[in-house]
């Protein structure tokens, strides 16, 4: 019950911030071209992108700091990687609180499709399982460092149907593809591999094996979803780069 109240309180704070951002961006969005997608012209769509960027910056910064700390540990510290980490405990609460608020409000405003609903639910479940064990610091860091890619993504999602040919929209798309590959595919896949491969030998004694297997299955499912998206994102970024290269050649001619 205490954990549910904790998540609920953070989700409530994020929900208020989410809605407040929608009101604060009115002067800026009113000067933007309209989106070709009707639901994106709802001011709360822009507010969600601002709130999501704040979450990505806060959670990503904390998680990347934790990853650096793990990377600079002496070799043979696998047991430490499966223990808790104070930074990740706080980042996990921030992250899960936002995911809950974003899921509820996103459904309410009709911003989420089926794939993103599954994505949110998987992340909430994984973080809840990890927090219930009070451990898995490295795993939590690899998961939450993926939020770094949300910074260029949120700008791209805001502008892709408003000014698709603007240089900043294209730059954000390519930057997101690079960040997605680095944090969500490379770092995220390593985190899943590390947990699945080493959990049998380094799982804390007080954690039930069934719970660890459930967490491992959730990680694999989330990772498969990331790779599915990664192929699509990579193709889109390649098209942007080819179009840019073709335009440069045409100007030179």
Name each region found by the language model.
Residues 1-145, 157-253:
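Membrane-helix and juxtamembrane interface regions of eukaryotic multi-pass membrane proteins
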Residues 144-152:
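Generic alpha-helical transmembrane segments
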